[in-house]
Amino acid sequence: MTVIAAPRAPYSAIAHLADVSRSELWKLRTVRSTYWTLLAAVVSNVALAALLGILLPSNLSARQDATIDSTRVSLGGLHLSQVAFGVLGVLVITSEYGTGMIRATLAAVPQRRLMLAAKTIVFAVTALIVGIASCLAAYLAFQAFLPAGDGMRTSLSDPGVLRAVTGAGLYLTVLGLLGLGLGAIIRSSAGAIATLLGLLFVPSLLAALLPQSWQDTIAPYLPMNAGETIITVHHQAHTLQPWPGFGVFCLYAAAALTAGFILITRRDA
């Protein structure tokens, strides 16, 4: 008697992506540099916020207290933690090229774009959780050290404050994705990190050498200037509005990731 086997349920692309994502999460969790990099980001963010909360009130007049964007000040550690998030984004992909483990990864997952998509998803979720949590902790630490009745004291319910705090976490996440995209393009840790830092800081320095009218036109669209609009509560002249500015910053990350997805299928491992 012939036995007809029941047809196997189709293995969907979503299920495959979920399996690969679990594998990438396991790899991210078992690498020590992940914990040290994220710890450095959180500590620098919160510690600097607490330090500013202690030192600023005694160095500012009451009039300055009332006009300063204290929410942005409380997130001043972002300039340090952003480097850690960017470096981690780079290492998510370049560390495998450096050790040669990328060959084993691609042998297990021949669909290269699927592999890169899984890395992107896992990193984005991890960075978003840690980024928002660290920025919220930084804001609360800053507020905790301000004297009662100080003009810089704010609440998360005040207009724009919650958006700025959560937006800071979004900024760190997108910056890390920019690093991941550059890592996929360059495939060298040192080269990708140098390119990322150059892209963040060098254009702003060069723009400062231009005539003021040119600065006002160009500077708002530079990566870091555009991205940091999301963490401002008080809009400043010659800068983009928070969400449009953040959208411009996202375009930089999207361009890097798109190039990475294209190149990863056109080059040998």
Region locations from a protein language model:
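Residues that define the loop-to-transmembrane-helix transition and helix capping
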Residues: 35, 113, 190-191
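Helix-capping/transition residues at the boundaries of transmembrane alpha-helices
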Residues: 27, 94, 105-107, 179, ...
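Secretory targeting signals
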Residues: 2-14, 34, 38, 42-88, ...
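Transmembrane helix segments
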Residues: 189-224
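A short amphipathic helical element positioned immediately N-terminal to and/or at the very start
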Residues: 17-29
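Short cytosolic juxtamembrane segments of multi-pass membrane proteins
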Residues: 265-269
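Generic structural signal for small/hydrophobic residues in well-ordered secondary structure
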Residues: 24, 109-111, 182, 188, ...
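Transmembrane helix boundary and interhelical loop/hinge segments in multi-pass membrane proteins
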Residues: 86-108, 112-113, 120
